[in-house]
């Protein structure tokens, strides 16, 4: 019975911590990191200040938890998007880019926290951001290596080409997050796909590129 009670207590703690994190996500999304205070989160989550500090050391600790969870979510999206990139490469490339962009588009508040609010906060966050980029690049490099070996693409340097590919995604996402026009991020999927295919000298059919994008967007 002691074990059961301990387990139930831990589950309640985990649920409360998750509720604080979920609430903080909404507050950070509305006010940004610098505009949010611990009091804002406490009031929104309907908890005491003591409860907040039981789970988190300070606002930065809470934000770091959000950042880490967001990093995992977007990394998993990238991994999922690249799974079939080498199958019918023009179709696969377009599906990969469309899927990743659609994931970001559907999670714009989280993306804003990840790509904008976390920039330049402190050396620790800059290190985390660099590690995230490195994970993205390393994972992409595995698929680019397959492309190079199969002769499907012109890849003189796998690391540099992987960095460049991730860079095109990152810069388009950053522009979209700061853009006030109503266009969706997935509107960029076609141009971004064609640009990368041409940069890697990959033969493609325009119809295949459009078909791949449509297949992904129609599933959303």
Question: What feature does the model see in each segment?
Answer:
Residues 1-4, 99-102, 106, 138, ...:
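C-terminal peripheral helix-coil segments that are non-catalytic and often amphipathic
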Residues 9, 154-165:
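Membrane-interface starts of transmembrane alpha-helices
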Residues 13-25, 41, 62, 66-74, ...:
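Generic hydrophobic, amphipathic alpha-helix propensity
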Residues 19, 27-61, 65:
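Helix-turn-helix
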Residues 56, 116-121:
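Short helix-capping/turn signature of helix-turn-helix
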Residues 65, 80-106, 165:
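Hydrophobic alpha-helical connector segments
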Residues 72-79, 123-149, 159-163, 171, ...:
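Amphipathic alpha-helical packing segments from all-alpha helical-bundle domains
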Residues 81-85, 114-118, 176-180:
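Secondary-structure edge/capping motif, primarily at the C-terminal ends of alpha-helices
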């Amino acid at each position: 019975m002691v074990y059961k009670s301990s387990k139930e207590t831990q589950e309640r703690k985990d649920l409360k911590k998750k509720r604080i994190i979920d609430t903080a996500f909404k507050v950070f999304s509305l006010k940004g990191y610098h505009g949010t205070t611990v009091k804002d989160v406490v009031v929104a989550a309907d908890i005491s200040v003591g409860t907040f500090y039981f789970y988190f050391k300070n606002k930065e600790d809470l934000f770091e938890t959000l950042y880490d969870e967001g990093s995992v979510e977007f990394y998993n999206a990238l991994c999922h998007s690249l799974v079939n990139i080498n199958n019918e490469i023009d179709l696969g490339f377009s599906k990969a880019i469309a899927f990743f962009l659609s994931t970001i588009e559907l999670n714009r508040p989280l993306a804003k926290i990840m790509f904008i609010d976390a920039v330049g906060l402190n050396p620790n966050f800059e290190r985390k951001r660099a590690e995230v980029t490195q994970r993205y690049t390393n994972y992409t490099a595995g698929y680019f290596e397959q492309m190079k070996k199969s002769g499907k693409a012109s890849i003189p340097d796998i690391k540099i080409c992987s960095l460049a590919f991730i860079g095109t995604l990152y810069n388009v996402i950053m522009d979209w997050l700061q853009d006030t026009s109503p266009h969706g991020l997935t509107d960029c999927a076609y141009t971004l796909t064609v640009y990368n295919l041409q940069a890697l000298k990959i033969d493609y059919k325009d119809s295949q590129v459009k078909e791949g994008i449509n297949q992904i967007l129609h599933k959303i």
